[in-house]
Regions:
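Alpha-helix termini
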Residues: 45-50, 105-115
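Short beta-strand micro-motifs in enzyme catalytic cores
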Residues: 54-56, 77-79, 157-163
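A short helix-loop-beta-strand connector motif used in the catalytic cores of GNAT acetyltransferases and
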Residues: 44-57, 66, 156-157
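Short amphipathic alpha-helix that is part of the acyltransferase structural core
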Residues: 1-43, 57-59
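Conserved beta-strand in the GNAT
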Residues: 57, 63-72, 78-85
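Conserved acetyl-CoA-binding loop-helix of GNAT-fold acetyltransferases
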Residues: 86, 92-108
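Terminal substrate-recognition subdomain of acyl/acetyltransferases
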Residues: 2, 9, 109-209
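Alpha-helical elements of Rossmann-like donor-binding domains used by nucleotide-donor carbohydrate transfer enzymes
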Residues: 19-23, 98, 102, 129
Length: 209
């Protein structure tokens, strides 16, 4: 395949966005994918939206081969990498690693690149190979289970692992417990966060950096 190109989509890129969201939907099981309606909504510019969402489309020879979705959290100087995906028919060719490297490069270019960090989640459906690839790329994993709530069945918990990558150095005055409770409540709702994350939060308090 040709050289990989990663493009940041805008809400006005209607055709490209339609193709992206169809591939995104095919790449994740219902428990782990947020609805495409929500993704369409959150990439629309709004003065009230303080946490920008980046939808990156990955192309090779003008063919859409995968993508990524990140959430930028200026309050915590963090980028949260919610999704990286490759077209099912093209997996096993190293495209996931190329997309990951390009996401890190592009997020590092921004004004936040000096001292921000990027977080990511993995689950059993990510595959052991993806876990190992992230570790080789420089991501560090927390030892304890990270509880992801199912988007299809809110009372179901999907066991995951949380990891992070430092762009340069840790942010100043960084509060990891506040960040993780905020992210969990944002993604899954306050009730789920109180029920499933707070009892485990002590395992994520110590900054492993």
């Amino acid at each position: 395949m040709g050289k990989l190109q990663l493009r940041l989509l805008k809400h006005t890129d209607r055709v490209e966005l339609d193709h992206y969201l169809r591939l995104y939907s095919r790449s994740f099981n219902p428990d782990e994918r947020v609805s495409t309606q929500i993704l369409r909504w959150v990439i629309q510019p709004s003065p009230a939206r303080v946490n920008p969402v980046h939808l990156f489309a990955a192309y090779s020879d003008k063919q859409l081969v995968g993508g990524a979705c990140t959430l930028v959290l200026p309050m915590f100087q963090v980028v949260f990498g919610s999704y990286i995906f490759v077209a099912p028919a093209l997996r096993g060719r190293g495209l996931g690693a190329k997309i990951l490297r390009e996401v890190l490069r592009q997020e590092r270019k921004g004004v936040h690149g000096w001292n921000w960090r990027l977080y990511g989640e993995v689950t059993a459906s990510s595959g052991d190979g993806w876990h190992k690839l992230l570790a080789r790329a420089g991501f560090r994993f927390f030892k304890k289970m990270w509880p992801l709530a199912s988007y299809q069945h809110p009372n179901r918990i999907v066991p995951g692992r949380l990891c992070y990558f430092n762009f340069r150095r840790p942010p100043e005055r960084f509060s990891q417990p506040a960040l993780l409770t905020y992210i969990h409540a944002l993604f899954y709702g306050p009730e789920t966060m109180h029920r499933h994350l707070l009892p485990r939060l002590k395992h994520f308090v110590k900054l492993e950096a």
